[in-house]
From Swiss-Prot:
Record flagged with keyword Transmembrane: no
Binding, [4Fe-4S] cluster: C62, C187, C274
Listed pathway(s): Carbohydrate metabolism; tricarboxylic acid cycle; (S)-malate from fumarate: step 1/1
Keyword Iron-sulfur annotated: yes
Annotated PANTHER family: L(+)-TARTRATE DEHYDRATASE SUBUNIT BETA, L(+)-TARTRATE DEHYDRATASE SUBUNIT BETA-RELATED
Annotated protein name in UniProt: Putative fumarate hydratase class I
Keyword set, alphabetical order: 4Fe-4S, Iron, Iron-sulfur, Lyase, Metal-binding, Tricarboxylic acid cycle
Organism: Geobacillus stearothermophilus (Bacillus stearothermophilus)
EC number: 4.2.1.2
Gene Ontology terms, MF aspect: 4 iron, 4 sulfur cluster binding; fumarate hydratase activity; metal ion binding
């Protein structure tokens, strides 16, 4: 199979940089449902612009290229060891070329391998079948949405919905609750795969397997088809919306599978995937390794360009939204003037900082003066050019809630005035913003090309020993846009949306399926 390496490399690059047609159709449909001038409409306009930029730049749609998971069906007699080794080489090369972010971290030492290889990685699952070609599918599922996966053991009590029993209606309640609990932290609007039955590990495997189905397919099981349709209709009544900003579309796809279980266990497992649903597949000639056919590419191309001029006009004339320009160092007085809903455009220097940096700063001095500065929750994709200078390939926000134990203390300790990420933060941070005079800025999750385009230069880097995603990058930006979703007056859009969506969730308490 002399062409297999080339085919696997192409599959990896295409999966990271180009959304499949079925996903694009779902996003376009969501865009058409939103009311013009809303935060959700603005977010979807940014998302579709980002998709176009990733196409043109052949660069990652989202900087978090996730944990590569391959599902492969092969004819009897094919050398699976050879296939796996070829995939590893292609993964390492794609990482070196900036198509994947180095995401493989030793769980004990915290060391990043730098090439997306390591114990158990990438995940490659084989299955034999009696066909004369190979079926290779790849999903790149980022950490933000992976962390919103959830598993229920029935019977159980669910917030807003009451008791969920061991029946189809209990399953219905679990799925609705799974969408509710994700809020905007998994980069909604999202896609979910649901696995009913099995043990804990098999249930999650089944849930993730559903994500390999076409978005617009029809479940052959009549009960599950009805359940999928019900969830799609009613989950979108929760009002969580794109990025958790509120809106008409919270869920873009729901696929449910079922398997047998043992009498003592009844699990409902939900795999949540962000809007940047990066999964593709190919059929491979087992003799040559060449690609015979691409999967998930049926139907017409989706053109997001048609309404671009209208969106730009609406964005520039929306009288309900204040747009404020900020440049660090920022004063407390400037921060106190900001309120939830304001759109901020940042110029000047921002500093990235995520899990390793926040843990480090609790016990160490900062490598730079952070007084009045902006911390960006981001693990970018970076490459060195031929002159040895760092170049930003992708730079969207990461999920901020992971920094909740540290954020308020660090802001006060170093005088930080703004933190930027996605999905919002909790009560401890909100209280610190109020006491200290700070704001939380929500950037559009997954919009890695859109934000990379706002970065004019990499001015420096500290703590690179933590690995590229976890280092502190000094980025000079221009017109870097985000929304104030938590202000210094105790207001939180995330808290408001969570409260209102819980009220809406409780409307679905009564039985539907007998």
């Amino acid at each position: 199979m002399e062409k297999l390496y080339e085919s696997m490399y192409q599959l990896i690059v295409e999966t990271s940089t180009k959304l499949p047609k079925d996903v694009r159709r779902a996003i376009l449909k969501a865009k058409q449902r939103e009311n013009a001038g809303t935060r959700a409409a603005m977010s979807l306009a940014t998302i579709t612009e980002n998709i176009k930029m990733a196409d043109e730049n052949v660069s990652p749609i989202c900087q978090d290229t996730g944990l590569p998971t391959f599902k492969i069906k092969v004819p009897v007699g094919i050398n699976q060891i050879q296939i796996k080794e070829t995939i590893k080489k292609a993964i390492a090369q794609a990482t070196k070329d900036g198509k994947l972010r180095p995401n493989s971290v030793d769980s004990l030492t915290g060391e990043n391998s730098g090439d997306n290889l390591g114990e158990g990685l990438p995940v490659v699952k084989f299955e034999q079948w009696e066909k004369d070609y190979m079926d290779v599918r790849l999903i790149l599922k980022g950490g933000g949405c992976e962390n919103k996966n959830i598993q229920y053991s029935l019977p159980c009590e669910l917030e807003g919905l009451g008791r969920a029993g061991r029946d189809l209606d209990g399953i219905r309640k679990c799925i609705l609750h799974a969408v509710y609990q994700a809020q905007g932290q998994g980069c909604s609007a999202g896609f979910i795969g649901v696995g009913i039955g099995g043990d804990r590990s098999a249930g999650y495997d089944l849930a993730k397997e559903q994500l390999f189905r076409e978005v617009d397919d029809v479940n052959p099981n009549e009960e599950l088809r009805q359940l999928e349709e019900y969830i799609m209709e009613n989950a979108n009544k929760l009002g969580i919306g794109t990025m958790g900003f509120g809106g008409e579309t919270t869920l873009l796809g729901c696929k449910v599978g079922a398997m047998h279980r043992i009498p003592a266990s009844f699990f409902v497992s939900v795999a949540y995937n962000c809007w940047a649903f990066r999964r593709l597949g190919v059929h491979i000639d087992p003799n040559t390794g060449e690609i015979i056919k691409w999967l998930y590419q049926d139907g017409e191309d989706v053109d997001f360009q048609e309404n671009a001029a209208q969106e730009e006009h609406l964005a520039s004339t929306d009288s309900e939204r204040r747009v404020i320009t900020l440049q660090a160092p920022i004063t407390e007085e400037q921060i106190r003037e900001l309120k939830v809903g304001d759109v901020v455009r940042i110029n000047g220097i921002i500093y990235t900082g995520r899990d390793a940096i926040h843990k480090y700063l609790m016990d160490h001095d900062a490598p730079v003066d952070l007084n009045g500065q902006i911390i960006y929750h981001c693990g970018p994709v970076m490459l060195k050019d031929e002159n040895g200078n760092w170049e930003v390939k992708a730079a969207g926000p990461t999920t901020s809630i992971r920094e909740e134990p540290y954020q308020g203390d660090i802001m006060k300790k170093f005088g930080i005035r703004a933190v930027m990420g996605k999905g919002g933060m909790g009560q401890k941070t909100l209280q610190a913003l109020k006491e200290h005079g700070g704001v939380y800025l929500n950037a559009i999750g997954g919009a890695a090309q859109y934000y990379a385009d706002c970065i004019e230069a990499v001015e420096g880097v500290d703590l690179l020993e933590f690995g590229i995603p976890e280092a502190m990058w000094h980025l000079r930006v221009k017109d870097f846009t985000a929304v104030v979703t938590m202000d210094s007056h105790g207001n939180s859009l995330h808290e408001d949306i969570e409260k209102s969506s819980l009220e809406k969730l409780s409307q679905f308490k009564e039985p539907v399926f007998s």
